[in-house]
Amino acid sequence: MRVCWLVRQDCWHQRIKLPHLEAVVIGRSPETKITDKKCSRQQVQLKAECNKRYVNVKQMGVNPTSIDEVVIGKDREMKLLPGQVLHMVNELYPYMVEFEEVAESPNVTQRKRKRPDCDSQEMEAEAGASPSQCSVSPKTGKHGAAKEESLGHWSQGLKISMKDPKMQVYKDDQVVVIKDKYPKARHHWLVLPWASISSLKVVTSEHLELLKHMHAVGEKVIADFTGSSKLRFRLGYHAIPSMSHVHLHVISQDFDSPCLKNKKHWNSFNTEYFLESQAVIKMVQEAGRVTVKDGTCELLKLPLRCHECQQLLPSIPQLKEHLRKHWGG
């Protein structure tokens, strides 16, 4: 028998059971520990199709619920597949689904828990991708064997970006580098491994050399494409990515981009929500895994603060105007 769990990604202990074909309504409640009043008490209705391994999500609240950054829409429905990320409201409170095989006998019940489909190879072009119903033949590598993909586990925009020579800036047998589809700065690339690794949560010491290679490739791209530019760069990971598959951000620190539109965008790169690449490598080297603190998603709500001089700014337009003073624009 197969059962389905809804698993909060920024609070590792939280799991909500979704019985087969039963409508479950969740939102702001003690069960989810969501207290944000922008999240309705009846934000979404979830109905698990355990046999087919997906969950039907209906947005009931007024404020937007999204799957892999695609907004569902009030009273509309979308399928949530293993490997995809459901944000309960306003791109906050990330959840994923896990399916678990439960083998029953007269005297004992054994459970075999499945990972949330790391093999879906769902990656990010950093926003606005549409769900795909196409399958793609994945590459394999020593850092993770890729299995046959299930239908619809890729976001169409990313698949196109990864295969599109115009988006690719570098590739080798371990990684591909693409331009971020919605760059948050003048220069913004994503370094993505071909190996199927769903998130930092599943990274182990086995992936250490891959992480080092990703960092080295990121530095190579900076050198190759910016030359003698005086722009500063940071290389790092979002603690809780908006879409599934490990990816390293390589981003210039000017943040001069029309795609930088809101507080979440800013704070995802300018608080501890952004994990430095070298810090992640050191963590894996010393502890064998990456630890993300509970409540990390709350960092996205912090006031806007200039990353250069720490001045508080009331809005994104005023922050952008302020930043021009630092880079002389």
Curated annotation (Swiss-Prot):
Residue interval(s) of motif Nuclear localization signal: 111-115
The keyword Amino-acid biosynthesis belongs to this UniProt entry's keyword annotation: no
Entry EC no(s): 3.6.1.71, 3.6.1.72
UniProt domain FHA-like: residue ranges: 23-72
Compartment(s): Nucleus, Nucleoplasm; Nucleus, Nucleolus
Chain positions of motif Histidine triad motif: 245-249
Cellular component terms (Gene Ontology): chromatin; nucleolus; nucleoplasm; nucleus
Site (Interaction with DNA substrate): S161, H238, H249, K264
UniProt cross-references to InterPro entries, sorted A to Z: FHA_2, Histidine_triad_CS, HIT-like, HIT-like_sf, SMAD_FHA_dom_sf, Znf-C2HE, Znf_C2H2_type
Domain of life from the UniProt record: Eukaryota
Domain HIT: start-end pairs: 155-260
Keywords: DNA damage, DNA repair, DNA-binding, Hydrolase, Metal-binding, Nucleus, Phosphoprotein, Zinc, Zinc-finger
Active-site residues, as the UniProt record annotates them: H247 (tele-amp-histidine intermediate)
Phosphoserine modification, residue list: S120
Stretches for region Interactions with ADPRT/PARP1 and NCL: 1-95
The record's note on its domains: The histidine triad, also called HIT motif, forms part of the binding loop for the alpha-phosphate of purine mononucleotide.
Role description: DNA-binding protein involved in single-strand DNA break repair, double-strand DNA break repair and base excision repair. Resolves abortive DNA ligation intermediates formed either at base excision sites, or when DNA ligases attempt to repair non-ligatable breaks induced by reactive oxygen species. Catalyzes the release of adenylate groups covalently linked to 5'-phosphate termini, resulting in the production of 5'-phosphate termini that can be efficiently rejoined.
Name by which UniProt lists this protein: Aprataxin
Species of provenance: Rattus norvegicus (Rat)
Record lineage: Eukaryota, Metazoa, Chordata, Craniata, Vertebrata
